[in-house]
Structures are given as C-alpha cells and as structure tokens.
C-alpha cells in the first residue's frame, strides 16, 4: 500500500492554495464542496477565482507566498505555474509537518488527490498512487455508470434512522443483518425510484417486525474455487461479505480471504499433508457451536465443497443438530487448474470421459479399481496424489496404461505462481517430486495439447516443459486446432 486511504473532515478548516490560475481553481472548487476555509496566496487571480473572492467564498491574501502563510493552516496545495515556488512550498510544509500536495508532481507530495465518485454522503475514491492517472479515471467512469444516483439519498435516509434501529435492535449483528436486508430489498428499490416517503414507511415496517423475523444462526458451505479470486462465484462473494465468522482451510487463497467482510472473525481449520491439522470432528463441533450462538457462519473450502472436500460429512453433522444450512458450489481444481494450464479435460479426438479420484483415502476405504482408471481415451485427474505419484504410475502401468501416456503435474493452479510440469507416466514421480503443494496430477492424451494451448502465466510462454513428443497429437500443426 503506497498511500493510506483516508477521508479528511475539512469543514471550517483553513487550507492554503498557492497559485491563482486554472489549476488552483480546480482544486479550490473541490475544497469548497468539502466546506474548507480556503486561503489563496497569489498576486493575481483569474476571473473564476476573482468572482469567488468578491463573493467572500475564498480569502485572497493578495500577495506572493510567504513562509508565514503555512503556520496556521491545516494543509497546503501548491498549484502555481512556477515549479521552483511549488517545491519551496513543499519543503517548507514538510519542515512544519504539514500535509502538502504539489499538483502533478508526485515526488513533492505527502498526499495525493484520488479520482472521486460523489454520491454525497457516499464517496468513493479511486487512486493508482499517481502511477496511472488515466487508468484511475477509467475506473471512476465505470463505477459512475454502475452506481445509481439515488445512492446518496439511500445513505441520508439510513442515517436518519440509525438511532431508531439502534434502539430497537440491541446487537451489532442484528443491526448489520437488518441493514443488509434493506439495502438488498424493497427499501432500496423505492429509493432508486425516488419514492423516498414510501421508502421510509417500508423501513418503519421492516423495523417493527425485524425481531420476530430473526432466524438466528446458520451455516453456508461455500466453495472458494481453485485459487484465483476472480473465479469465486457472485453468490460466494455475497456469503463471505455477510458472514459473522469464516472457517477456512489451507486451500483458500489470500486473494479470496481479502474479500471476506473486514469485521468478520476468521478461524483457520485447515489440513496440510505435512503440517498443521485440525481434526474434522473439531471443525464440525465448531460450526454447530457458532451457529447456536446465533452467528452467520461461512465454511469456506477450496475448490468445490462436494468434490473431495468432505462437505457432505459436514452437512450431515449440521442436519443431525438441526442447524439451517445452504451450499454455494465452487469451481473444482480439476476444472480450474486444467483450464489455466491449457489442458482440456475432454476432447473428441483423445478423451471421451474424465475421471476424478483422490490420492488421500480413508484407511478402511475399498481398494481402487485400477483397471478402470487405466483405460485409454479418458482423462484421469488425481487430487492430493503428489506424495503417491510413484505408486500411482506403477499401478496404472501394471493395469495396462502405456508408460508413454502424457502426464502433467499442475501446482498452485490458477494463481500467479502456477507451474505446469509435463512429461509421461514413466516419469510422473520425477515431475511430482519437486512440485509445490497444492498439486494436481493429470494423466491422458489431452496433456499433449498443453504445449499448444497454454495461455496463463509462465507456461503461456513455453516454460516448464519436459521435452516430449506425442505421436497421438502428430496431426495437429502449429496453426491448427482440434475440434
């Protein structure tokens, strides 16, 4: 974070602007909207600023900048056409520990101006830290188009009702849920349609019946996807933004966790093959306890909760204890990681089916049907199999799969650090040995398409490939794509 985002209350505070031209006028316009007491140090003013001075909206000092001008002001803006003067203002302000901005000179600023979306009292600031002002402006334009003009009215009405809601609903959780419901319901729709009187009546009615409608605690089982925060579903984002507490595992990326509601409690309940482990029974008991406390719990799991995620076991526990629950599916690693590696799971020339299996089973689980897994013309995806890669390769070859079958190990799938190492079934153990976890094993002729279809990260530039040729793919030329 290059700059700390902060909103300053300038109402009635003295602010010094050095300069009397168009650049100074633009900054002064913003300062006046914020209620600042604007003082202008300049020998001459342009027509716009002269009019403001005549109306006593700004205090014109009618002289060149002097060091004494900065002593009694809250912050300083240097907006003259004289660069040497602007930098002198900067150094004097710095020596007095006063916030200072030299317009269009990032190296001489202790604060900068963001692009602003103004729906007063709602304000949204967008900044590129001065690196790409045009990008910040484009982002502001997109946000302007997304946010309704009625947003300010909604905030003003809500502000008038805050005390009433606080008096009726005693806990922070109750109040937060109440407002979330209003901002996503009929109240918001009425304000959007400029029916503010009806909106306030709706608010009053909702508040009157809010205590009776409180449903207490619940658990939402949310699939976080394979890692890339952009692959989290909209429903999943809504759930983690409304959660009181989030129980997450080791496969949930930092990018996903950064989207969790800031005030929500976060509890790690993960499992790692070579390290920290939270017993599943403890996680189940924790979900039940938190829900019974009336909290909105999100059980956030990497990938999809019902694909080797023990989601079914967790829901059985909740059902047994009569805890309300819901499920938000996620993109499983076999789908996400292979797509980012340029490996299609099915392809009518090479694979008519895809099989997902886990390399980490219960001790009393039935024997694996290796004969079925060793079939050709299918794609085999193995979760949590890196530690058993040698055994997997041996058994598949024993049951008829060719040692020349293309194979890949995808680690850190869909994340910037994603690596895809390709080879054959014969050297699968070698590929897996150096792959960081989490890693996914993919076996099948479709792996041969990786070289042509890789598009993401380093693999998109042709790196991390074990040199192999695959006869089955010989018909695909550099400019040709299979159907």
Swiss-Prot record:
Binding locations of NAD(+): 22-23, 43-44
InterPro entries: 4pyrrol_Mease, 4pyrrol_Methylase_sf, 4pyrrole_Mease_sub1, 4pyrrole_Mease_sub2, CobA/CysG_C, NAD(P)-bd_dom_sf, Siro_Cobalamin_biosynth, Sirohaem_synt_dimer_dom_sf
Entry keyword annotation includes NAD: yes
Disulfide bond residue pairs: none
Superkingdom of origin organism: Bacteria
Record PTM Phosphoserine, positions in chain: 128
Protein residues bound to S-adenosyl-L-methionine: 226, 302-304, 307, 332-333, 384, 413
Region named Uroporphyrinogen-III C-methyltransferase: 217-483
Function per UniProt: Then it catalyzes the NAD-dependent ring dehydrogenation of precorrin-2 to yield sirohydrochlorin. Finally, it catalyzes the ferrochelation of sirohydrochlorin to yield siroheme.
Name by which UniProt lists this protein: Siroheme synthase
Organism: Neisseria meningitidis serogroup B (strain ATCC BAA-335 / MC58)
Biological classification of the source: Bacteria, Pseudomonadati, Pseudomonadota, Betaproteobacteria, Neisseriales
Chain's gene name: cysG
């Amino acid at each position: 974070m290059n700059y700390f985002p902060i909103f300053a209350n300038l109402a009635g505070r003295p602010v010094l602007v050095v300069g009397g031209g168009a650049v100074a006028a633009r900054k002064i316009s913003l300062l006046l909207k914020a209620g600042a007491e604007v003082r202008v140090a300049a020998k001459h003013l342009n027509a716009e600023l002269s009019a403001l001075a005549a109306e006593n909206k700004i205090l014109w000092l009618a002289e060149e900048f002097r060091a004494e001008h900065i002593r009694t002001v809250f912050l300083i803006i240097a907006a003259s056409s004289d660069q040497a003067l602007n930098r002198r203002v900067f150094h004097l302000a710095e020596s007095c520990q006063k916030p200072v901005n030299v317009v269009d000179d990032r190296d001489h600023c202790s604060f900068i101006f963001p692009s602003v979306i103004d729906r007063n009292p709602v304000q949204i600031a967008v900044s590129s830290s001065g690196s790409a002002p045009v990008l910040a402006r484009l982002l502001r334009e997109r946000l302007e188009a997304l946010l309704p003009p009625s947003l300010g009215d909604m905030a003003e009405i809500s502000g008038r009702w805050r005390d009433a809601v606080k008096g009726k609903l005693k806990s922070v959780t109750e109040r937060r849920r109440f407002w979330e419901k209003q901002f996503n319901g009929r109240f918001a729709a009425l304000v959007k349609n400029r029916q503010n009187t009806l909106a306030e009546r709706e608010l009053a009615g909702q508040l009157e019946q809010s205590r009776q409608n409180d449903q207490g605690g619940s658990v939402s089982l949310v699939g976080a996807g394979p890692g890339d925060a952009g692959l989290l579903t909209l429903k999943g984002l809504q759930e983690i933004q409304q959660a009181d507490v989030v129980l997450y595992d080791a496969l949930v990326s930092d990018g996903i966790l950064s989207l969790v509601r800031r005030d929500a409690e976060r509890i790690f309940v993960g499992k790692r093959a070579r390290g920290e482990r939270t017993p599943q029974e403890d996680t189940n008991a924790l979900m039940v306890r938190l829900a019974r406390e009336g909290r909105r719990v999100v059980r956030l799991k990497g990938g999809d909760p019902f694909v080797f995620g023990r989601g079914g076991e967790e829901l059985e526990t909740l059902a047994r204890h009569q805890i309300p629950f819901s499920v938000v599916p996620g993109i499983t690693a076999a789908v996400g990681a292979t797509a980012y590696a340029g490996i299609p799971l099915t392809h009518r020339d090479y694979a008519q089916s895809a099989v997902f299996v886990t390399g980490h089973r219960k001790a009393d689980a039935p024997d694996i049907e290796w004969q079925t897994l060793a079939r050709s013309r299918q794609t085999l995806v193995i979760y949590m199999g890196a530690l058993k890669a040698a055994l997997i390769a041996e058994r598949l070859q024993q049951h008829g799969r060719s040692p020349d079958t293309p194979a890949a190990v995808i680690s850190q799938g869909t994340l910037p650090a994603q690596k895809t190492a390709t080879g054959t079934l014969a050297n699968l153990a070698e590929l897996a040995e150096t792959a960081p976890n989490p890693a996914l094993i993919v076996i099948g002729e479709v792996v041969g398409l990786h070289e042509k279809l890789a598009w993401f990260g380093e693999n998109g530039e042709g790196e991390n490939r074990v040199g192999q040729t695959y006869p089955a793919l010989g018909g695909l030329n550099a400019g040709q794509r299979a159907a």
